[in-house]
Design a protein with these regions (language model features):
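Short active-site neighborhood of thiol/selenol oxidoreductases, capturing the structured segment around
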Residues: 56-74
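Bacterial signal peptide processing site
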Residues: 23-25
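A short beta-strand-turn-helix
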Residues: 43-62
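Thiol-/selenol-based redox modules, centered on thioredoxin-like
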Residues: 152-196
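Short, internal strand/loop/helix patches
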Residues: 114-161
Length: 196
C-alpha cells in the first residue's frame, strides 16, 4: 500500500513538472504553424554534389527557402537577412543551416549554387535535383513557381514564394516567415529552437 506521504510527494512532483512546463512556454515572433507545417522531408543534391535528405541536417535548426540565383531582388535580400540572423546568433549559429532550394535547376548548376550560397553564409547550402524532386518538395510546402517568358537573350524570371520555413533540430515544422520578417524576429525564434 502506498503511504499518504508518498502520494503527497508524487502529487507535489507532478505539480512541479507541470509548472516547469508552463515556464517553458515559447512566445514566437514569426507565425507558429507547428500544427499544419509538415516535417522536413526531401531527397535532393547539395551544392557540393552529395545526395542529401532531411536526415542529413538532423541536429540543426533548418531554415528552408525556395529561390533562384538569377533572382534580381527578393531572393538576395532574403538570403542576406537569413545570413545576418545566423551571424547574430554568434557561436550558436553553427547549429543552423539555411537550405536554399533552387526552383531553376537549368541555370542553377552546382558550381553556381555553391558560389551563390557561400557568398551569403558558410551555413547556407544550395539544394537542387531533378524537376520532379524539386516539385515534390515544393508541393509538400505548398510552394508554387512558374517561369516567365524568355527575352531575346534567353533570360527569364521565375515567380515563386517568398516564404521561409523553419524546422526544429529534430525536423519538426515549426515556424513560417517571409522576406518581410525582421532579422531580430528570426534571431529571437531560432534562438528558442536552438535551446530546445
Amino acid at each position: 500500500m502506498i503511504s499518504r506521504r508518498a502520494l503527497l510527494a508524487a502529487g507535489s512532483l507532478s505539480v512541479a513538472f507541470a509548472l516547469a512546463g508552463c515556464g517553458k512556454k515559447q512566445h514566437w515572433d514569426l507565425d507558429n504553424v507547428s500544427s499544419v507545417l509538415p516535417n522536413l522531408q526531401f531527397h535532393l543534391t547539395s551544392d557540393t554534389g552529395q545526395k542529401v535528405t532531411a536526415e542529413s541536417y538532423r541536429g540543426k535548426v533548418a531554415i528552408l527557402y525556395f529561390g533562384y540565383t538569377h533572382c534580381p531582388d527578393v531572393c538576395p535580400l532574403t538570403m542576406s537577412h537569413l545570413a545576418q540572423a545566423v551571424t547574430e546568433l554568434g557561436p550558436a549559429g553553427k547549429d543552423v543551416r539555411i537550405l536554399f532550394v533552387s526552383v531553376d535547376p537549368a541555370r542553377d548548376t552546382l558550381p553556381v549554387l555553391r558560389a551563390y550560397t557561400q557568398a551569403f553564409s558558410p551555413q547556407a547550402v544550395g539544394l537542387t535535383g531533378t524537376m520532379d524532386q524539386i516539385q515534390d518538395v515544393a508541393k509538400r510546402y505548398h510552394v508554387a513557381f512558374n517561369y516567365g517568358k524568355k527575352d531575346q537573350y534567353g533570360n527569364y524570371v521565375v515567380d515563386d514564394s517568398a516564404a521561409i520555413y523553419i524546422f526544429s533540430k529534430d525536423g519538426r515544422g515549426t515556424l513560417i516567415g517571409s522576406d518581410q520578417s525582421s532579422v531580430k524576429s528570426i534571431v529571437h525564434d531560432v534562438r528558442q529552437l536552438l535551446a530546445d
